[in-house]
Amino acid sequence: MGATPDDAAALAGVDPARIVHDLVAPQNIDNGALAAFDESGVFDAGLDPFPTSRPALTDQAKEKGEALGVKIKPSGNRRLQPVVDRFFYWLRASKLETQRLGYWWANRMLNTKRPLEEKMALFWHGHFVSSEEKVRDYRKMLKQLQLFQAKGLGDFRELLIGVAQDPAMLAYLDAAANLKGAPNENFAREIMELFTMGVGNYTEPDIREGARAFTGWNFAGTKFVVNDERHDGGDKNFLGEHGPFDGVQVIDIILKQPVTADYLAGKLYRFFVRDEVPAKLRTELGDVLRANKYQIAPLLETIFRSRDFYSNASCGTHIKSPVELVVSTYKKLGLGVVPGVPDFHETISALGQTLFWPPTVAGWAQGRSWITPGLLIERGNFARDVVFPDIGFIAPDRHPGGDFQILQVGEKLARGLDISSATMPDNKDQMATANMMADRDEDFNTRYGSYRGWQMALEKVKPLPRHTAPLNLTQMVLASKTPVKTPADVVDYFVGRMFLVPPSPAERARLAAFLEKELGTKDIAHAQTYMEESLRMVLHLILSLPEYQLG
């Protein structure tokens, strides 16, 4: 995730082999200064198990007289309203808590002494995809992240079994629907297609037989459970082998396939080096993974010590993902905490990568997909928001944002309207039929439940810190070990600090001319009492260059 000049200087005299070894095998490096995730305390036992939908919730409440730990009213209007309020509370609270989780993770990336652990956790997060959109439980997303952090550099077999038994993955790929006699193929398909082998290396019968092996695997809260009555213990024919396989045995058969190591090695190479993986190199790297019994660290050590890694074809060809861009920018600027302004979650979302909300089961496309004309502009906007914070900033974790219906309900209630009037849409012709039916149901009001859910969540979820980046570019430039005397020196200083692939001499000259014009002089010593704003302007331009997107 980048380094400061001091970080680079500290490693200048160290044997490169030792640097790589400590990077891939950091177990003896003390990382105890990193704080654990500070949970808000939004969960209680009554919320588990959480219903699949609001209609499922209200049906359960009507049938049993309670749901989500809340009893329905014996009589009166909107008897189910407290239950519906609680449903929306958890949706909002888990979403906000997951955003807090992303901010916490970004700070770990920024401050860890074991950077490859977090970089690998980011890789696995895009490889073994789960999404809060469907999981709807920050606790499960946290537990999955901790699995990636703990095992991401170790034994791939252990990691793969851990993922197959992970509550977030089980929820995301519908484990509850995978039953003896009626197997659900989602996980069996994805474990081969996306997680281990790649398209074309298995058959549809392999998927069906593999799904049978995983029947009965489920979760209770945040724990993995096996329901023996729902597990199909019969014989299966899977990838050319025959037997009464369970999920772990199916995983072992997958790992025996030669293509599995090649597929995984190729994907890791693309993540760390470049998009094009020569077939011969992919096979050679697969051989390394097989020879080391699927230990990830030796493979990465081989990649990082190879001539290919430092070749012209590889160096400076990696397009930074949004998370890499944002965290490395803060790292190179010497920040110790991720700023709360701009908002981390909104920033990476605008750039195309929302942690814990991947777009599909295939994760993010990586590479050139990160750069479109619109996204390149957004990257420049991010740089500007760091050096010139938005004075109109509204904390998104304290505000429902684009959900205008919730805002309108709150405004109408504040004016003294009753619940029915406050929740009635302004344009009845545009109201969906389903919502019309919900409004006529005297047992509950869906719009009011959504409004109350936000209120209740805001009361419980801890707010994110909202400080801006404590930048002093004047001090930074003047403290340079190489004297900075002219605008051209300033540009060279920022390029040396922030870039792997420097801009052209002509581009540097244009930036220096811009800075000279803003300062009204070529003499940095003369301008040092008033140059902070001009330095921020030129840094914004520098960080918006195409070359800065490369790592």
Spans of model-derived segments:
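N-terminal accessory alpha/beta regions
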Residues: 5-149
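Hydrophobic/aromatic pocket-lining and membrane-interface residues
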Residues: 124, 159, 538
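Structural motif
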Residues: 96, 111-116, 182, 202, ...
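Active-site substrate-binding loop specific to GH73 endo-beta-N-acetylglucosaminidase modules
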Residues: 72-89, 98-105, 129, 137-350, ...
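Short, compositionally biased low-complexity segments
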Residues: 1, 78, 93-95, 119, ...
